[in-house]
A protein has these predicted regions:
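Acidic, glycine-rich segments characteristic of secretory precursors and extracytoplasmic regions
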Residues: 4, 8, 20-71, 108, ...
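Short, surface-exposed recognition loops and adjoining beta-strand edges that mediate ligand/DNA contacts
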Residues: 34, 61-82, 163-165, 200-219, ...
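Elongated scaffold/linker segments in the mid-to-C-terminal portions of large proteins
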Residues: 42, 47, 55-58, 76-108, ...
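Conserved, well-structured interaction surfaces
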Residues: 44, 48, 52-58, 82-157, ...
Length: 516
């Protein structure tokens, strides 16, 4: 079976380049390293393998966008909360550089970079019977995937080694200097703009979830937004909204149906990962689904929402009900009865259940990845959203507010709330129109949390809006969690210990990033 050298930093960028990983188990047959890149079919198979790295399968079907990524995007914020081991450490800001979620996210994200580098370099050097158009199309998708991975790495870790080619000598990668976020942005923006010219507006059939013009424009716009370059961001976010005007995208009128398993590719989807139970099923339902629930059975509630964040939803917002709470479990509570415990959402400050047959929830599971499931098998058919139209509309609200003020942002903010059935700003007396740019930014940030919860957005959002330390410290106080005060140095996570042992630049940087 064909295996591609995997580029991971330090233990990745050194030992990882001598390790191997299957790119796509059903496509490679008897290919070897020497004969893997001969035909156009070979390159398309390798490309599919790089897409698969976003959501490794089988065996690692919980890594990167299949769930693990949430630990460095929605945990270490006010959203994610778990009660055991390394997830608890991420929840309460007591993590260290040996935390498995830092180590494994780093490893799997760099796997995308490395495999994209390998295929791109082989593609550029290959003499293969392929049209120039098809060659450019494969390259454009690889550049998009590599750019997405670098965006995710720099969101989490800031400066990282910029690796753009296949490493013939892995030892040369040891102790690589760190490249600034600005320089990495310049590199991936160039790649993305080249890809934008080549990628189609949409794909069909089995290629439906591949990278498109809309996906590339969304990523470009969000990279500019991260740098607070709202003028350039507007150009690319407006491109995506123009595609909506052409009928490429539209908002599903029911926010819940965005997540129905039968709705594999939602009309508002811009870039996503599709699953089929029988071929490439995921484990996202296992990790995000409710524990001991009568309708969604056999799930673990491993990743869940903090109760203080859930309480921020207005009671009149239907999205507040899109979680699992106040239900009777299916597992008998003891050997004397067939009845399960009642899992109750506690009132704020309530610490004691009303009786011995009730358990107070410590966190709450979202319905996003288990809504109207078609199958109750271990592997699920849930779709994982990476970019969707609601996100882009809220990006537009943020851009307009920062360029033109609250009035220009209001229609876009209310568009998302209206679709959800939530009270509208300026229509409900409890929600007056935010009068200042600062107040509107807070409203947009809040709305991004409500709409995009557990979609890998929260930590980058809080940092971009300049609200990370304030929000997380207030959250820790409300949770009565002591011992850590979040500082600006903690906006970037510590580099994994496995990497710092082989990279002096990371080792020198890490102490200030650790919780104190």
């Amino acid at each position: 079976m064909k295996k591609i050298l995997m580029g991971l930093l330090a233990t990745g960028l050194v030992s990882g380049f001598t390790a191997c990983t299957d790119l796509e188990p059903t496509l490679y047959s008897n290919l070897t390293t020497s004969n893997a890149y001969i035909t156009e079919k070979d390159f398309n198979a390798a490309l599919v393998g790089v897409y698969a790295d976003l959501n490794p399968f089988p065996g690692d079907a919980w890594q990167y966008y299949a769930g693990y990524f949430v630990m460095i995007t929605d945990y270490t914020t006010d959203i994610g909360y778990s009660t055991s081991s390394d997830p608890l450490a991420m929840s309460v800001m007591s993590y260290d550089s040996n935390n498995q979620y830092l180590r494994d996210n780093w490893r799997y994200i760099y796997q995308v970079v490395s495999n994209a580098n390998t295929v791109l370099q082989k593609l550029n050097n290959a003499e293969v019977d392929m049209t120039e158009e098809n060659k450019q199309l494969i390259a454009a998708q690889l550049k998009f995937l590599r750019a997405l991975a670098y965006r995710d790495l720099t969101d989490a870790f800031g400066p990282v080694p910029l690796v753009t080619e296949y490493a013939e000598n892995p030892l040369a990668m040891r102790d690589m200097p760190l490249t600034s976020v600005a320089d990495i942005d310049a590199f991936i923006l160039k790649d993305l703009k080249e890809a934008l010219e080549v990628l189609p507006e949409k794909w069909t059939g089995t290629d439906l979830s591949r990278a498109t013009k809309g996906a590339a424009a969304t990523l470009i716009g969000q990279i500019y937004m991260r740098a607070h370059d709202y003028q350039n961001a507007k150009t690319y976010i407006d491109m995506v909204l123009a595609l909506r005007d052409k009928g490429i995208y539209s908002l599903n009128p029911d926010f819940k149906n965005v997540w129905a398993e039968s709705n594999k590719y939602d009309m508002g989807s811009i870039f996503c990962i599709l699953h089929e139970v029988t071929s490439n099923g995921g484990e996202i339902a296992n990790h995000f689904g409710p524990s001991d629930h009568p309708e969604v059975q056999g799930r673990w509630q491993f990743y869940a929402i903090s109760l203080p964040f859930w309480r921020k939803y207005d009671d009149a917002d239907p999205r507040k009900q899109f979680f699992y709470f106040n239900y009777t479990g299916v597992s008998p509570r003891d050997d004397k009865t067939d009845y399960g415990f009642y899992y109750m959402m506690p009132e704020k400050g309530q610490n004691t259940p009303p009786n011995d047959t009730t358990k107070l929830l410590l966190n709450v599971a979202t319905k996003k990845y288990t809504y109207e499931m078609v199958s109750d098998l271990y592997y699920d058919g849930s779709t994982i959203s990476i970019f969707r139209l609601a996100d882009v509309i809220l990006c537009k609200a943020e851009i307009e507010n920062n360029l033109n003020g609250p009035g220009a942002a209001l229609p876009y903010l209310n568009e998302i709330r209206e679709r959800a059935g939530a009270p509208l700003y300026g229509k409900d007396p409890r929600f007056p129109v935010p009068a200042s740019q600062e107040a509107m930014n807070q409203a947009i940030l809040d709305e991004r949390g409500f709409e995009l919860v557990f979609e890998y957005k929260r930590r980058p959002d809080l940092i971009r809006f300049g609200k990370y330390e304030e929000t997380v410290n207030a959250h820790l106080k409300e949770m009565d969690i002591t011992g850590t005060t979040v500082t600006p140095d903690m906006r970037y996570l510590p580099y994994p210990m496995t990497e710092t042992k082989l990279n002096s630049y990371m080792e020198a940087e890490n102490p200030k990033r650790l919780p104190k």
